């Protein structure tokens, strides 16, 4: 007969609420915390509380930051006429790692999803529209994932902005570097051909 440890289960349950953490991983994380010294556990708990208290949305681009305005919006060398729209801060960080993009961003904090009842009012679309209307924006690059939700979000943004004369583009997607054509699905191949560029 297995004996449960209520405090451990409660801790694992809280870890299980984190995105992408299953029951087994949650339990492993709970055991890791139990194995910490009391001082380490206090620092861990304080780091969580500190992040929760100090991290907020940048008032300009909605990126997560612990400053008044995020470092990207504060950077005067950035091209402010181009906005790259992303679903979340993780996507922004992935683009920044490439170091190829020199414009600014707008973080939606989600994507449209009728199946999950996520409407334009549930994400930071109003802030994007207001920003485009009040700033000298020449191009909006939509960099949402190539999923049904990402495509729906991209199409919705395009329909809102194009009538205002804003150039709206979508990042290309297709065959990854090192990928083999025979393993690509029809949609990926079609996107690769549609997103082709002169060589």
Residues covered by each model-derived region:
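Cys/His-rich Zn2+-binding cysteine-cluster or related metal-binding knuckle/ribbon modules and their
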Residues: 2-8, 17, 27-92
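Signal for well-folded cores of large energy- and translation-related assemblies
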Residues: 16, 34, 49, 66, ...
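Extended interfacial segments that mediate partner engagement and assembly in macromolecular machines
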Residues: 26, 75-141
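Short glycine-/acidic-enriched loop or helix-start segments at secondary-structure transitions
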Residues: 70, 95, 152-154
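Long C-terminal interaction/binding lobes of large macromolecular proteins
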Residues: 129-141, 145-199
């Amino acid at each position: 007969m297995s004996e449960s440890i209520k405090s451990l289960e409660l801790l694992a349950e809280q870890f299980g609420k984190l995105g992408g953490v299953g029951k087994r991983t949650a339990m492993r994380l709970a055991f890791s915390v139990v194995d910490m010294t009391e001082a380490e556990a206090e620092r861990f708990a304080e780091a969580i509380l500190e992040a929760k208290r100090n991290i907020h949305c940048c008032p300009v681009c909605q990126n997560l930051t612990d400053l008044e305005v995020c470092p990207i919006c504060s950077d005067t060398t950035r091209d402010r006429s181009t906005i790259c729209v992303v679903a979340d801060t993780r996507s922004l960080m992935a683009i920044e790692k490439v170091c190829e993009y020199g414009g600014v961003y707008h973080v939606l904090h989600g994507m449209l999803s009728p199946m999950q009842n996520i409407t334009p009012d549930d994400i930071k679309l109003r802030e994007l529209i207001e920003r485009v209307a009040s700033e000298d924006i020449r191009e909006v690059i939509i960099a949402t994932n190539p999923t049904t939700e990402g495509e729906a979000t991209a199409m919705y943004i395009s329909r809102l902005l194009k009538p205002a004369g804003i150039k709206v583009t979508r990042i290309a997607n297709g065959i990854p570097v090192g990928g083999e054509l025979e393993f690509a699905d029809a949609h990926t191949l079609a996107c690769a051909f549609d997103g082709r560029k002169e060589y």
